[in-house]
Amino acid sequence: MTLLIDLIDETGQVSKEQLEEVEKLLQFAADALEVKDQAEVSVTIVSNEEIHQINKEYRGKDAPTDVISFALEEEGEGEIEIIGADDIPPVLGDIIISVDRTKEQAEEYGHSFMRELGFLTIHGFLHLLGFDHMTEEDEKEMFAKQTKILDDYGLSRSS
């Protein structure tokens, strides 16, 4: 199973090795979650200022956040199903991560920058796959999946 990943660090603050680790983690998660072969995802690393603007424009929240996901394959209510779409690899969507919040939260939670970057990446990826945390039950399921993927990959909270 190959996930096609477009990974961009607009800040220049994430090392080549860390970006490669994000790619490996996403491939690992895609395999674990049985994502369709050749599915596409983009991950963009931005500043607090940039994610603040995106959060304000698209979510109506006038503050920076850690991660935002824009799913492209969600079927909305009343949308017509496209015949043959199951044969085409899906474009899952975009994950946007604040490098500043990643650093802050890693320090706050007492683990590595890479563990926090991995957590935010998987959190955003699960949103692209339709998981959310709007109800307590959904939150438990989503967070259990996140933890399992990160632990199985080797990025546990102690990392």
Swiss-Prot record:
Q: What is the enzyme's class at the highest EC level?
A: hydrolase
- Any GO molecular function: RNA endonuclease activity
Main localisation = cytoplasm
Residues holding Zn(2+): 123, 127, 133
| Xref: SUPFAM superfamilies | Metalloproteases ('zincins'), catalytic domain
Pfam families recorded: YbeY (PF02130)
Mention one GO biological process in which this protein takes part, according to its record: rRNA processing
Gene3D superfamilies under this entry? Answer: Metalloproteases ('zincins'), catalytic domain
Compartments, as annotated in UniProt: Cytoplasm
Instruction: Provide the cofactor list for this protein.
Output: Zn(2+)
Q: How is the cofactor bound?
A: Binds 1 zinc ion.
**Which InterPro entries has this protein been placed in?**
MetalPrtase_cat_dom_sf_prd, YbeY, YbeY_CS
**E.C. numbers:** 3.1.-.-
Q: Which GO terms describe its cellular component?
A: cytoplasm
Keyword list (alphabetical) reads:
Cytoplasm, Endonuclease, Hydrolase, Metal-binding, Nuclease, Ribosome biogenesis, rRNA processing, Zinc
Similarity field: Belongs to the endoribonuclease YbeY family.
Function description: Single strand-specific metallo-endoribonuclease involved in late-stage 70S ribosome quality control and in maturation of the 3' terminus of the 16S rRNA.
Name of this protein: Endoribonuclease YbeY
